[in-house]
C-alpha cells in the first residue's frame, strides 16, 4: 500500500503589493521550521477579481495541503516555530474555521480575543489575551484557517463586489453546520494597523445580513453589532456612513 504523503499547510495569499509580500510574509516564512508548506500567490491585479471571496476561492481550489491558511501579505511570523505551532493546534482541535483574532458576544457585549500585534508600533490587537484556543462568533480576516475537507464542500460566499467580511461569512456558515469557530493563540505581527474600514464596508454588511437574516437576529463583527431587521439595519448603516464620512471611524 502506498505510504501517505506528509501533512502540509497550503498558504493562500491574495496580493497586489509585491514589496510587502516579499519583505514581510515571504521573509518570515523563510525562517519557519518543523513544518511543510506550499505558498499560493493570487495576483489580484492580474485576474481582476471583484471580491475577496472570488480571489480566495480561486486560490483555495489550487491548494493541496491538509489545512488552508488564507493569509494577508503583511503578516510576519515572529517565532521560527509559529507556523508549526498553528499546525499543531489544527491537528489537536476539531473546527470548521479558525483564526488568530476573533469576536464573541458575552452577555450582550462584544469582546475581542487575540494575542497578535498590529501596526508599526506593534500594539495589542484585542482586549482579551488567550492561552488556549477559544470559541468565538466571528474571526478577523488577517489569517483564516480552514481544513481542506471543509473547504472542499464550503467556499467563501460572493455577497457582492467587496473585499470585506469574508471571514465573518465563513464563520456564519460554519456555525450553521455546528462546526466550531476558533481563535488560536499566536503572537504573530500584522504589520498594517488593521484599519480597513471604508464606505463599502457598510454596503457589504447589508449584503451579508440579508444573506443570513433568517438564521441570525444580529451579526457581530469587529466594527459593531448589526441587526437583521432591514429597517434598523439601513438606519444604522446610514448613521455609520455619515459618521465615517465626518470622523473617519
Question: PLM features: residue spans?
Answer:
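Conserved donor NDP-sugar-binding/catalytic core segment of glycosyltransferases
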Residues: 80-113
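The conserved acidic donor/metal-binding loop of glycosyltransferases
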Residues: 72-76
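Active-site-adjacent helix/loop segment of glycosyltransferases
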Residues: 177-249
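Short aromatic/hydrophobic "clamp" motif used to bind/position activated sugar donors
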Residues: 68
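Short, acidic, metal-binding catalytic loop of nucleotide-sugar glycosyltransferases
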Residues: 3-6, 24-37, 41
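A recurrent flexible, glycine/aromatic-enriched loop bordering the glycosyltransferase active site
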Residues: 125-146
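Donor nucleotide-sugar recognition loop
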Residues: 152-173, 180-190, 196
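Glycine-rich, basic loop-to-helix element that forms the pyrophosphate-binding segment
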Residues: 46-63
Amino acid at each position: 500500500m502506498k505510504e501517505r504523503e506528509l501533512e502540509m499547510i497550503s498558504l493562500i495569499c491574495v496580493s497586489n503589493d509585491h514589496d510587502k509580500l516579499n519583505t514581510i510574509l515571504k521573509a518570515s516564512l523563510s525562517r519557519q521550521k518543523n513544518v511543510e508548506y506550499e505558498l499560493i500567490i493570487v495576483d489580484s491585479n492580474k485576474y481582476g477579481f471583484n471580491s475577496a471571496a472570488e480571489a480566495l476561492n480561486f486560490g483555495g481550489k489550487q491548494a493541496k495541503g491538509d489545512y488552508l491558511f488564507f493569509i494577508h501579505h503583511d503578516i510576519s511570523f515572529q517565532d521560527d516555530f509559529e507556523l508549526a505551532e498553528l499546525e499543531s493546534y489544527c491537528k489537536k482541535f476539531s473546527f470548521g474555521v479558525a483564526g488568530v483574532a476573533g469576536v464573541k458576544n458575552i452577555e450582550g457585549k462584544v469582546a475581542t480575543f487575540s494575542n497578535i500585534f498590529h501596526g508599526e508600533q506593534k500594539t495589542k490587537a484585542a482586549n482579551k489575551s488567550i492561552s488556549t484556543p477559544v470559541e468565538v462568533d466571528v474571526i478577523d480576516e488577517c489569517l483564516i484557517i480552514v481544513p481542506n475537507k471543509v473547504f472542499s464542500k464550503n467556499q467563501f460566499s460572493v455577497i457582492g463586489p467587496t473585499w470585506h467580511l469574508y471571514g465573518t461569512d465563513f464563520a456564519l456558515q460554519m456555525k450553521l453546520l455546528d462546526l466550531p469557530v476558533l481563535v488560536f493563540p499566536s503572537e504573530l505581527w500584522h504589520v498594517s494597523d488593521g484599519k480597513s474600514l471604508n464606505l463599502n464596508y457598510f454596503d457589504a454588511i447589508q449584503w451579508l445580513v440579508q444573506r443570513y437574516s433568517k438564521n441570525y437576529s444580529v451579526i457581530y463583527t469587529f466594527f459593531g453589532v448589526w441587526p437583521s431587521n432591514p429597517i434598523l439595519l439601513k438606519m444604522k448603516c446610514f448613521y455609520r456612513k455619515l459618521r465615517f464620512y465626518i470622523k473617519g471611524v
